[in-house]
Amino acid sequence: MASDALIGALVSVVGAANVLVDADVQAGYETDWTGRFHGSARCVVRPAGIDEVVGVLRACSAVAAAVVPQGGNTGLVGGGVPRGGEVVLSLRRLHAIAPVDAQHGEVVVGAGAVLGAVRAVARAAGWDVGVDMASRDTATIGGMVSTNAGGVHVVRYGSMRNQVLGLEAVLADGTVVGRIPGLRKDNTGYDLTGLLTGSEGTLAVVTRVHLALVAYLPDRVVALCALAGLADALTVGGALRKTLDSLFALEVFFADGLALVSEQTGLGLPFDRSYPAYLLVECAGRASSAGLLVDALAGALGECPQVQATAVAVDAASRERLWAYRERHTEAINAAGIPHKLDVTLPFDRLVEFERAVRARLDEVAPRSRVVCFGHLGDGNLHVNILGPPPDDFAVDDAVLRLVAAMGGSISAEHGIGVAKRAALERSARPADLAAMRAVKRALDPREILNPGVLLASTGAVSS
């Protein structure tokens, strides 16, 4: 439990109802949603606006108390949960969504606004959010900015960094930085917005975000293609990227993952037999364009002899069913146990080799494990999920990440570094790059108040 002095200071800022010190109430903030990462919080503070965030950080900074910013707690690398006695700064009450600028396609939202809610507001105004993911009903915009989240539409719109026009954030000492509203073009000095995007709450606490929206494309066509393996999926995916202007998503999964989804959710299989690999393709267009989308997709797939079977869906219910085979992977994996979740990117020409090599390597280091891979094929991004090894067996993670580094890949495509991949980052990044990162951390948070031990190793400058 926090000291009386700090508790009193925090209560004076946000009120007693929003300083949580009861262990049972804190529990939901102390464990990530996979159940793999957990710790104990000094207390949980729930500010409702930027002035309260400023007050909380000033109070914590005054006594050198470490702070862990937390959004929807849907992260997968342990970056948003306490490690041992930090103050958890929950941003869920900063959920305001301003009216959409319907003429220019922009909106300002609070860091605690949930993606699904922002998307609904945007669509009502004829616009959409360029990033989407299965956790849309719990993931917050602030958390997505802090991890530079990706998702299923990166192939079309890019990651979260591409959607952010400006942001407002608070440094560890309570200083407010950033610009709201942001501008489409602004080359005045260093790109602070770009720096804070993807910084995992280690440099500042994001409080508001100015998003650039994309046109809402209501007509969708989804195809699920059965293939002989990842090599064929890459061939087909490359052809579709060249020929389909309407391409909206390009996702890959495998027979073992589909079997697990069916086993855990009861979802029937899409074809009358199993195939080694599956490519889910979505095309999108403006109203009354479904027929054109179907024709274009059918024509493009017709030029791909690698496709062994296809299911095509136009109506919403059928589209959702095909998407369920991909999106329910995470649900099925979590239902089967506490997974090791690794999120990596490989050069396209190394993906096939990696997919084979990672399974072989895991057979060596964790012979009784169950390996499920799926991912965003258009970005070279695979999610490697390992079931079976104990949650604290980081040798399993290490084996995969060493393989990724050896093949010229990235150990984090969209989930961030957190605590889970910190050692791998220190091992695989250039020493000069790490030195530059540490210099930035020292400049913006010299006392290591914000998320110590996340992304970079802590020097132990703060109290917990």
What are these regions (language model features)?
Residues D24, G71-T74, L94, A134, ...:
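Short, ordered loop/turn segments at secondary-structure junctions
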Residues M1-W33, V63-A65, A300-S318, A406-I411, ...:
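N-terminal accessory segments
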Residues A64-P69, T74-G79:
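Active-site cofactor/substrate anionic-group-binding motifs, chiefly glycine-
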Residues A96-E251, L450:
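FAD-binding subdomain of flavoenzyme oxidoreductases
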Residues T175, R422-S464:
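Activity-critical C-terminal alpha-helical subdomain
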Residues D22-Y29, L211-A215, V221-A399, L403, ...:
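C-terminal substrate-recognition/cap domain of FAD-linked oxidoreductases
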Residues M1-R58, G75-G105, G257-G268, D315-D343, ...:
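N-terminal flexible segment immediately upstream of the FAD-binding catalytic core
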